[in-house]
Amino acid sequence: MKAKEINELTTDEMINKEKEYKDELFNLRFQLATGQLENTARLKAVRKNIARIKTALRQQELNK
């Protein structure tokens, strides 16, 4: 998800997306530990998406 797409979301949508990504990251870590994860780059992508969402939320908070 790109930063531009994230900035177009409402605050509630961002919070929901962040929760979805955190759940996905949790599952990916389990797959990695059990040796079932094929696409290890997905871990990095999910972490970066969480960071982008947190950054956008903070920017909105500061702009108010």
UniProtKB/Swiss-Prot annotation:
One of its GO terms (cellular component) is cytosolic large ribosomal subunit. Keywords: Ribonucleoprotein, Ribosomal protein. CDD domains: Ribosomal_L29_HIP (cd00427). InterPro entries: Ribosomal_protein_uL29 (IPR050063), Ribosomal_uL29 (IPR001854), Ribosomal_uL29_CS (IPR018254), Ribosomal_uL29_sf (IPR036049). GO terms for biological process: translation. One of its GO terms (molecular function) is structural constituent of ribosome. It comes from the Bacteria. Belongs to the universal ribosomal protein uL29 family. NCBIfam families: L29 (TIGR00012). This is Large ribosomal subunit protein uL29. The gene is rpmC.
